[in-house]
Amino acid sequence: MRSDIIKDGYTRTPHRSLLRATGLKDDDFKKPFIGVANSFIEIIPGHFFLNKYSEILKDEIRKNGCVPFEFNTIGVDDGIAMGHEGMLYSLPSREIIANSVETVMNAHALDALVCIPNCDKIVPGMLMGALRVNVPTIFVSGGPMAAGVGAKGEALDLNSAFEAVGAYETKQIDEKELKFIECNACPSGGSCSGMFTANSMNTLCEAMGVALEGNGTVLALTSEREELIRKAARRICEIALDERYQIRNIINEKTIKNAMVVDMAMGGSSNTILHMLAISREAGYPLDIASLNDISRSVPHITKIAPSLPSVHMQDVAKAGGLSAVINEIAKFNSDLLSLDALTVSGESLGDRVKNAEILDESVIHTVQNAYSKVGGLAILFGNLAEQGCVIKAAGIIGSRQFSGKAVCFNSQDEAIKGISKGKVQKGDVVVLRYEGPKGGPGMQEMLSPTSLIVGRGLGADVALITDGRFSGATRGLSIGHVSPEAAEGGMIGLLKDGDIIDIDVDKFSINVRLSDTEIEARRKEWKYAGKPVNSRWLRQYQKLVTNASNGAILEA
């Protein structure tokens, strides 16, 4: 056992003495030690109940002959951190979480790992840390939140609350209606109910085989989710000492592609691109961002979920057959798109896991013959405005997939929010929101507030937004993020001026500004960037080490 290094032999007398202080007895030193990486935190709706889930998990682990040791990571709620300087800390928290998992697991030589994430950066952070440790690992999330119910019986979610702000400002709703949405959009614990970043990443864990079936869709705070927790506990005890289930044997080149195929089929959050670029590097199989368009061209988009389709949420996907039904439908269309022989932590191949799954509601999970689009729900655009690429959630486009308009430039998210609220942005404009990339922010803030204001003010089909920052998974509309190179490193987005004409063609995967090479070079010579004052020591460290979005915004020392 890996843990023998801390518990076996006479030289480990002091180590065992310390472990006995935690309650261990003689027999416990013969058992596998299981790390339980929890992310319990009271301020996040998807996490305030995870302490109860970890108790269920640990109890089941003990019953099955292993010794659990729980530790916690930090967490940031992106919705609560949104629209103020707290969002500067969201993406950097991913690195802290990854480092925490690596540190605890390796410092104490634990044999296996169960991760209990749920929201936003916690899932990819734990994946990155687990890949560094490389022991048998199972992910079991807290589960999605149920959708809220509106005054007319319509589905509500967190995005409804953000867009309600713009609707209130333009007097489309009154204060009473605004308060009703506030009080009903998030009715229970769980990761926000649509195909936002958290549920996208939990779904991809299932697609990669590092989580059990149902991980992405079974609702939080249900008996079904509790049983999934117990199953994960029993299974980790079965595989704790089996090298076949080391996480790098589960997450590899084949299963990373499987994840991206599922991502395209379901129109996941654009943040999944950023995180999968980082995760693939930790796994030793770095994704080429340009290659993702090859997947997008091949995979039909068969499932639209909020925010792309506000009436459909994760609970509906669960009832319609779950992720297995989505994967099986894609496999029947073209089995070559997926590595169906890939091993999952349950011991079966991905193909065996999904082969009997059926679509139970074709209004939620479409057949390939009735796909929303013949191409995937995410796209990488290239051109003179983004030589290293940028990302759009094509599934969330409200209007045309082609757009040309005049640039309206803002040098920060705060500037953009004020400008949009004051009516500076009109139909036909392209909002340029820059100096918000990984280095420029620093921290690559999410731009849900500006995009929600645009949609809430009725401009969602008539205005595009491009940024070197990123978007919440709740974002919809013609919103293009992760522009690389970013403005702070001299990227073209930093050279744009008000009135420049920008051409976007999602079907051609292109984004360009109508400027000659001579004009671009002249502007580049004039460009100067002094940088923003950064008071936080941690954010200064992050700014110094972080790479741009085309590399997954990973840290390089």
UniProtKB/Swiss-Prot annotation:
The record lists [2Fe-2S] cluster as bound by: C119, C192
GO terms for MF: 2 iron, 2 sulfur cluster binding; dihydroxy-acid dehydratase activity; magnesium ion binding
**Catalytic activity entry:** (2R)-2,3-dihydroxy-3-methylbutanoate = 3-methyl-2-oxobutanoate + H2O; (2R,3R)-2,3-dihydroxy-3-methylpentanoate = (S)-3-methyl-2-oxopentanoate + H2O
Q: Give the Enzyme Commission number.
A: 4.2.1.9
Q: Which GO terms describe its cellular component?
A: cytosol
Alphabetical UniProt keywords: 2Fe-2S, Amino-acid biosynthesis, Branched-chain amino acid biosynthesis, Iron, Iron-sulfur, Lyase, Magnesium, Metal-binding
- Keyword field contains Lyase: yes
**N6-carboxylysine is carried by which residues?**
K121
- Which named protein is this? Dihydroxy-acid dehydratase
What lineage does the source organism belong to? Bacteria, Pseudomonadati, Campylobacterota, Epsilonproteobacteria, Campylobacterales
